[in-house]
């Protein structure tokens, strides 16, 4: 068994500059070897670095007594970027776990921490049931939790950041019989661990192979379990080569730390588009079956059943949801536009029935959308959200604009939307934010402003459609809030509604909101909003995978060949990947042109190609019962939303928003065309 480095051993220094060199010396680096005999507790061995001569390696790592492994380490690179190569050779059959620690010289209390797609700052926006400083100030996690297998430590006082990234082929994983404690792997894994530790008040980068997780392992939604250590078997005479890169940078703030690390990660991994057989036209043809089989017409408001479905049956349920995970109205617009272009009368008729029925029966007494309705229980959700309301208005504005272009007018819909947009003006706080949740009478349920950017989009669109400058001014105030409280503080949180934590959608929505305002303004204003869109975009991009997570044999996603590059982690609380993208691909293309940044367009192509892979159709249903019902909760690491674990989906899913997201990805230029 031999794991080779993905890249040749060479000095790399992407985006690295510093006055001081990394102190990668035996005095500042510690290493340990854990050895396990099945049926016995593991034994820990502290290792010493002994300089060796006339060898391709710089050091041999030795213990206080003879070990069943020979360990060699080579260090290459510049002062600020060190490539560390480990050779592990088995002298006898052995089960082992290797770990290393590099101190940074920064006080732990002065530092913020970054593990892409999983850890931002100190994760203090997350509940104590998820990984955060609420539980511990030191965390190590398995690499497949992260969109890049990397940890960075940012010292706010010195302006320095330190990072470690793993470099490998990542071609295998292995099952275990237990999820906690000392576990022996059933085969070969490529997955190691990475993280940060507080060592006597000093921050340290921690990394090793195979994986460990401490002080807890995050195994399910809001479920922390005891720590885990995995042990890799090496047969006598076999060897493994392991490679990491440790870097140091000067940065101005946490935002620049994330930006530089994303550029560095992209340049290091060089993700390429995934080769799939699905053109835009084929994708839409298959996805359109969702509009057919999910349509429900025996209720006061017609809708597409896209919430709380079971993957095993995909049978329609009684839940209608305007936005968020249902996205009924956006799907109705997509079905109408596609149906007319393809002469699909069934799609057109159903879509029009949805809009007509919502106009008649889809509103509360105060003029807000009935955003979630359970018909069999005769239950209407009374806690309203700015996100669902905004996404409903957004969809109807696209519908009205499309209808107007085709000579069809809907004055009652226009009246309804103006009432709603005026209500948004009333809801908006003096600081420009919008409450996350509220009642029909405008009383507040959740006053936090994390969902504010979702309101910016329909306000900008409403300004353009109704030519009412009040909506544009409200949109500007909302982005003023985003700039002050989210973007400048690098604190993106609570955009999604099924979790309250650091999440991808907050930064994605913030970037998109600034993009919409840039499209609607000119001169210095436009340039300012473009800069904000770019700054937030790096945080959004940090959630998307630059690498392909390995799966074990027998894990369905691996067996069907899923490549994870281009898929996005969801949030700290929900540690799975999904296809949430909507028109963010357009944002990336636009930013690429505005700032001459080819990485944005190139990675957008990776996202677009990769998110086609699990298209369910005859002979390739990917674990979903019905054609076109694209999967939602894609579990790529040792975590689940409630069922099934790595390599599978949760048993409950919401294809409604998934189809809507992919459809917008496949319909480029919508916002620019609407706002021009």
What spans do the regions from the language model cover?
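Glycine- and aromatic-rich loop/turn segments at beta-sheet edges
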Residues: 288-320, 360-381, 424-444, 483-501, ...
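Beta-strand/loop-rich accessory regions of lumenal/periplasmic or secreted enzymes
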Residues: 24, 38-40, 58-64, 70-236
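Well-ordered alpha-helical scaffold segments within catalytic/enzyme domains
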Residues: 329-345, 391-409, 454-468, 509-525, ...
């Amino acid at each position: 068994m031999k794991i080779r480095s993905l890249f040749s051993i060479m000095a790399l220094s992407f985006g690295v500059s510093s006055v001081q060199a990394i102190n990668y010396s035996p005095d500042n680096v510690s290493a340990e070897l854990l050895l396990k005999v099945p049926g016995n507790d593991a034994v820990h061995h502290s290792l010493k670095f002994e300089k060796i001569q006339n060898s391709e390696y710089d050091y041999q790592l030795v213990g206080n007594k003879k070990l069943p492994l020979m360990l060699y380490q080579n260090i290459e690179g510049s002062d600020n970027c060190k490539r560390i190569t480990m050779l592990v050779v088995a002298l006898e059959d052995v089960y082992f776990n290797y770990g290393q620690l590099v101190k940074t010289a920064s006080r732990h209390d002065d530092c913020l921490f970054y593990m892409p797609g999983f850890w931002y700052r100190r994760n203090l926006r997350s509940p104590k049931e998820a990984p955060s400083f609420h539980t511990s100030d030191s965390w190590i996690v398995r690499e497949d939790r992260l969109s890049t297998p990397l940890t960075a430590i940012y010292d706010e006082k010195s302006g320095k950041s330190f990072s470690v990234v793993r470099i490998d082929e990542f071609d295998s994983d292995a099952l275990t019989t237990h999820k906690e404690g000392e576990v022996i792997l059933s085969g070969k894994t490529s997955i190691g661990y990475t993280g940060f530790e507080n060592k006597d008040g000093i921050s340290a980068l921690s990394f090793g192979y195979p994986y460990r997780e401490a002080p807890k392992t995050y195994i399910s939604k809001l479920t922390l379990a005891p720590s885990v250590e995995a042990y890799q078997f090496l047969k006598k005479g076999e060897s493994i080569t392991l490679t990491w890169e440790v870097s140091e940078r000067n940065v101005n703030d946490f935002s620049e730390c994330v930006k530089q690390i994303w550029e560095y990660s992209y340049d290091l991994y060089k993700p390429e588009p995934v080769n799939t057989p699905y053109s835009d036209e084929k994708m839409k043809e298959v996805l359109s079956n969702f509009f057919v089989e999910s349509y429900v017409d025996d209720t006061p408001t017609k809708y597409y059943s896209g919430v709380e479905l079971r993957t095993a049956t995909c049978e329609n349920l009684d839940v209608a949801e305007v936005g968020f995970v249902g996205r009924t109205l956006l799907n109705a617009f997509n079905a109408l536009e596609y149906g007319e272009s393809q002469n699909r009368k069934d799609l057109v008729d159903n879509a029009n029935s949805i809009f007509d029925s919502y106009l008649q029966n889809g509103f509360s007494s105060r003029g807000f959308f009935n955003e979630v309705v359970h018909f069999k229980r005769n239950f209407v959700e009374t806690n309203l959200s700015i996100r669902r309301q905004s996404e409903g208005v957004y969809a109807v504005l696209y519908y009205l604009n499309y209808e107007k272009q085709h000579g069809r007018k809907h004055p009652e819909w226009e009246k309804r939307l103006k009432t709603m947009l005026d209500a948004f003006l009333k809801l908006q706080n003096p600081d420009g934010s919008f409450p996350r949740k509220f009642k029909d009478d405008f009383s507040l349920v959740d006053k936090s402003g994390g969902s504010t950017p979702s309101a910016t989009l329909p306000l900008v669109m409403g300004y353009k459609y109704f030519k009412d400058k009040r909506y544009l001014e409200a949109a500007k105030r909302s982005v003023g809030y985003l700039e002050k409280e989210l973007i400048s503080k690098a604190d993106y949180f609570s955009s999604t509604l099924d979790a309250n934590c650091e999440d991808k959608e907050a930064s994605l929505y913030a970037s998109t909101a600034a993009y919409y305002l840039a499209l609607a303004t000119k001169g210095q204003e436009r340039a300012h909003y473009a800069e904000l869109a770019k700054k937030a975009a790096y945080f959004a991009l940090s959630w998307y995978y630059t690498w392909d997570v390995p799966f074990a044999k027998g894990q369905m996603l691996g067996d069907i060949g899923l490549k994870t590059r281009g898929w996005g982690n969801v949030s700290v609380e929900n540690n799975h990947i999904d296809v949430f993208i909507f028109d963010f691909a357009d944002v990336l293309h636009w930013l690429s042109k505005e700032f001459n940044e080819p990485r944005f367009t190139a990675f957008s192509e990776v996202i677009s190609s990769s998110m086609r892979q699990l298209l369910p159709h005859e002979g390739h249903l990917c674990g979903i019962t019905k054609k076109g019902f694209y999967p939602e909760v894609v579990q790529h690491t040792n975590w689940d939303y409630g069922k099934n674990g790595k390599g599978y989906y949760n048993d409950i899913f919401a294809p409604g928003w998934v189809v809507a997201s992919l459809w917008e990805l496949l319909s480029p230029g919508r916002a620019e065309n609407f706002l021009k």
